[in-house]
Amino acid sequence: SLKQFLCFSCEPWRPAPTRTQQLMTRMRDAQVLLFEPPGKYSRQPGRRVRPGLTVCALPPVLEAEERHRLLFRLHYRKLGKFIRRQMEHHRFKEPLLWCTAPEHIHLLDEVPHRGVVYDCDRDWPHQSPRWESDLALAADVVFAASQGLIDHLSPCNDNIALLPNGVNHPMFTRPPAELPPELRGLSSPILGY
């Protein structure tokens, strides 16, 4: 059976792939359900961006500061309900959760799962340090993009692997494509897309 990954992305799906997109598109023999922040696709059902990978925009919900406990919990309960409905629709049972930001700690109690990955690619100065500590503690494995992030997270988890940011080198080093016959007789410059 296929492995199931439920990814909480802190960035929307883009034509120029982010770190999270690069990682999720490389999952082999897997189904990936990636949740992006609310945006222009919030009212649409999930969009299949490639075989085995569906992107769903989270619904816009009223955000509340943590000090407003009732509203804060309500915010994450509403997100959890939406995510569980999507899981049911896509037949996800107990996926591996792939978290990319400290705030995702609040979704762990809302979503059934069999394990947690925290992929940390940056510092989060505007999110509570406690959230990140709790997420790192809850994670079965932490991927960190730099040695500094490993040092920062190592008090909370001893299963940390360095996964540096990088470039998809083959994508940028392809040989130039052969000019189609219908364009060979045209003088330059040739503009198009």
Each model region followed by its residue ranges:
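Membrane-proximal helix-turn-helix segments that form the acceptor-binding/catalytic region
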Residues: K81-R85, D109, D123-A145, L149-L153
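A short beta-strand/loop micro-motif in the catalytic core of glycosyltransferases
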Residues: L33, A139-S146, A161, G192
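A conserved catalytic-core segment of Leloir-type glycosyltransferases
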Residues: Y41-F92
